[in-house]
């Protein structure tokens, strides 16, 4: 209905104004929770309603048409941006060890024994940041935000 009367740019603006703002609010805290799956289904439902397609249609191409990231990608992007903008809070492996290691430029992950920390956004963010190629890690924060 909305898509038939408005241009694609306006539909995207409506999505960002009404849904995306609520979707991304505090996502680094709740994005890894079991209820995030329900929110992702809701996001896909909104996209399908905007394009007036049936519920069995895949949303992958619709996300690409709208240039919108799906919820899991938004979560990963926000966590990586959080780690990049807060690098001063973390230490690299080179600062922890007195000898040189292969992963000396990676951020040090604190050893833990609880699954609570294992599911936290800090642990997940550090692991994801360490996986990034070094050319992305070396970018300034604002350029990093654009590349991610």
Which stretches of residues belong to each language-model region?
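Hydrophobic/basic alpha-helical segments
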Residues: 1-148
């Amino acid at each position: 209905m909305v898509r038939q009367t408005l241009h694609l740019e306006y539909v995207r603006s409506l999505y960002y104004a009404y849904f995306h703002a609520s979707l991304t609010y505090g996502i680094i805290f709740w994005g890894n929770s079991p209820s995030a799956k329900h929110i992702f289904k809701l996001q896909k439902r909104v996209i399908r309603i905007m394009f007036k397609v049936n519920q069995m249609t895949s949303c992958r191409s619709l996300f690409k048409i709208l240039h919108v990231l799906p919820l899991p990608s938004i979560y990963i992007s926000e966590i990586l941006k959080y780690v990049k903008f807060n690098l001063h809070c973390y230490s690299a492996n080179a600062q922890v060890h007195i000898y040189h290691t292969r992963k000396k430029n990676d951020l040090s992950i604190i050893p833990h024994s609880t699954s609570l920390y294992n599911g936290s956004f800090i642990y997940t963010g550090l692991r994801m940041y360490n996986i990034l190629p070094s050319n992305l890690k070396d970018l300034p924060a604002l350029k990093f935000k654009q590349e991610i």
